[in-house]
Amino acid sequence: MLDIKKVRQNPEIVVEALKKRGANLNLDEFLRLDEERRKLLVDVEQKKYKRNTVSEEIGRLKKQGLPADDLILEMRALSDEIKKLDDEVAQIEEKLHAILLTIPNIPHESVPVGKDSSENVEVRRWGEPRKFTFTPKAHWEIGEELDILDFARGSKVTGARFTFYKGLGAMLERAVINFMLDLHTREHGYVEVFPPFIVNADSMMGTGQLPKFAEDMFKLEGLNYYLIPTAEVPVTNLYREEILDGDKLPIYHCAYSACFRAEAGAAGRDTRGLIRQHQFNKVELVKFVKPENSYEELEKLTRDAERVLQLLGLPYRVVVLCTGDLGFSAAKTYDIEVWLPSYNDYKEISSCSNFEDFQARRAKIRYKEHPKAKPEFVHTLNGSGLAVGRTVAAILENYQNEDGSVTVPEVLRPYMGVDRIYKK
């Protein structure tokens, strides 16, 4: 959520900044309501001052044994008027808050201006795509032929875009999760948390999924609960409505979770295989930092996610998202895209974002430099470290062999106890 003072004092700057996102924002209603609210607050303060003056006069008259009936009636009338005005102010503040919740974050000045993903800017590449001496297969073909992925039964049991992992496929998924968590906790300094997979609406509001993206979420019928679309939601809200000790910042957390996304409008090739599932596993990285360090922390976060792919030996590239492709809550985002031979292209496997104080304002996460200091909003960051299903897909495709087997990346062998996946 944007700072209401920034919107009030510099509406033209906010509108122009959000135009770069492709958002045609009209702040007329917001500014009208804000002006009405401020006038009402002045009126309230004047009436409270008058009520206090009348109250003092009533006290003076009573001490002298003089009647004060008329003044008592006047004070009651003033109290009724103040209550009515307070109710009006509360209603207007509710409307202002609702409008603020729909306004996306302002892009950082370093974000390239562009209309959509075609104008994202490549930053760097790592590794060379493998040159096969045979025609490589897609991961869904490999998984079915090795009998380690069962899409048909997943569809039968639940519906489209649900999958059973079987045998060494299930073991590979688990190995990837454990490898990522071990790397981030032992080498990158993250503290692991294991969060709830169900959160309330306040948590979804805090990270920016609600109200804008309600149709992409799975809501539990009859309850104010949602299945999490990412561990970002519960882990960020871990400190909702708290004031943190500035000496304890930065705070780094990593978390494994299942993720659930309705994505009603999703279509095309990505809905085949493991690329775009309704349920998938992910290891998430979340940071709470001081504002002056947040962009340095974004670079570190991105490098931490990249390290997973480097150790797995998977070619990838990093792109910075342009303004038109930027997520609702993000001020700046790097996407890490892994090479998938079946696409003959790079596919997103991680998004690493700095939200600045956008989520912290919504979730009321602040910190104090010292006990007597004024609380300030933290900056929050998060990134996938990584999406597990897409990592498995990349391993199957990049490490496939002509005989139909798949070589297990060296760093995963201690977790699996095998160096190759064969059909049994």
From Swiss-Prot:
Q: List GO molecular-function terms, semicolon-separated.
A: ATP binding; catalytic activity, acting on a protein; serine-tRNA ligase activity; transferase activity
List its EC numbers: 6.1.1.11
Give binding positions for L-serine: T230, A231, E232, E284, S384
Q: Might you name a Gene Ontology BP term for this protein?
A: selenocysteine biosynthetic process
| Pfam families, per the entry | Seryl_tRNA_N, tRNA-synt_2b
Please provide the record's free-text comment about the domains of this protein. Consists of two distinct domains, a catalytic core and a N-terminal extension that is involved in tRNA binding.
| Annotated family | Belongs to the class-II aminoacyl-tRNA synthetase family. Type-1 seryl-tRNA synthetase subfamily.
Q: What's the name of the protein? A: Serine--tRNA ligase
